[in-house]
């Protein structure tokens, strides 16, 4: 890389301004995803496996549907929608209306009905991988739940009474039993305990043998989650990464390796200027799985389709601190 290009890269770094996360968005993300690290691994408790943020292909909508939490045991598969809503929640049939403290209303789909579509997409995905072959697999093994985590949400009786709805007070009984290992981990353990309790009382007739259950765990573990970009300043973009462009090379998402973190290391201060002037070290670098470190320049970018946007956009890597592959 030439001296001029190194200096241009450092100047572009100096011009970048930190982008901070909105406090309300940050709270919602922390409350609903619980533990960011379980998105790249999975959580086990009392023989049950819990996976978060899995996005299952839905041919009917020609898109992926996200399932917040999936709890697996040999007897039962629980598909769980997690919400941290506050205010009041009313049942209006096809929609649920949330009235927040300020009086504004938000219309949500009926989560019970919406979960049925996600269940069908999940079963279809299992069948494509040689699992869930029986016609009555869903009836014998699957349950759907909606978990409301926020104690400041008042839920209308018609919603709260539904057997597939878990309000915070119902979960609190299990939450109090968990050892103090951090709120998020206690919450996850409580969700699993609730599912195990439901399993014992529901009388499900299915029971997967060890080999088939292991195949099920692997199949769910391999389902994609969201990709994320952590920007300079802390704001996180969630969506789908399409391509990474470094120098003359373009890598599609599938070429970037398995899920995990790809730090984008920049020397933004005086040390970066020293590197640019002397050529000793790299102003910016990233390391992909199984590859040597790649030197970064001002022209390098990433093609990313953020949630809520109508089309992908190209973001300069000078704005990015970390790529999280889902």
What is each PLM-predicted segment?
Residues 68:
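Cell-envelope/extracellular polymer assembly enzymes that use nucleotide-activated donors
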Residues 71-98:
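Active-site beta-strand-loop-beta-strand hairpin of nuclease catalytic cores
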């Amino acid at each position: 890389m030439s001296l001029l290009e190194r200096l241009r890269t450092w100047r572009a770094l100096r011009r970048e301004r930190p982008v901070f996360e909105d406090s309300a968005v940050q709270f919602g993300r922390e409350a609903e995803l619980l533990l960011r690290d379980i998105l790249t691994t999975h959580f086990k408790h009392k023989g049950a496996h819990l996976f978060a943020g899995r996005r299952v292909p839905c041919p009917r909508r020609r898109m992926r549907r996200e399932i917040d939490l999936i709890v697996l045991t040999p007897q039962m598969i629980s598909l769980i929608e997690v919400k941290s809503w506050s205010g009041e929640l009313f049942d209006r049939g096809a929609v649920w209306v949330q009235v927040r403290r300020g009086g504004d209303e938000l219309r949500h789909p009926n989560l019970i009905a919406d979960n049925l579509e996600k269940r069908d997409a999940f079963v279809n995905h299992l069948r494509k991988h040689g699992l869930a072959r029986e016609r009555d697999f869903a009836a014998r093994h699957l349950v759907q739940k909606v978990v409301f985590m926020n104690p400041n949400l008042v839920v209308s009786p018609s919603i709260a009474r539904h057997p597939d709805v878990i309000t915070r007070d119902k979960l609190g009984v299990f939450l109090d039993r968990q050892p103090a290992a951090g709120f998020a981990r206690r919450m996850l353990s409580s969700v699993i305990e609730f599912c195990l309790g439901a399993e014992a009382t529901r009388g499900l007739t299915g029971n997967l043998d060890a080999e088939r259950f292991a195949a099920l765990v692997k199949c769910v573990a391999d389902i994609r989650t969201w990709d994320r970009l952590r920007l300079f300043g802390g704001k996180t973009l969630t969506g789908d990464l399409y391509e990474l462009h470094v120098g003359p090379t373009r890598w599609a998402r599938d070429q970037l390796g398995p899920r995990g973190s790809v730090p984008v290391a920049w020397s933004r201060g005086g040390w970066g200027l020293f590197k640019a002037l002397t050529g000793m070290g790299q102003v910016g670098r990233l390391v992909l799985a199984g590859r040597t470190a790649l030197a970064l320049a001002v022209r390098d970018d990433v093609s990313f389709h953020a949630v809520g946007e109508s089309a992908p956009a190209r973001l300069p890597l000078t704005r990015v601190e970390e790529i999280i592959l889902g």
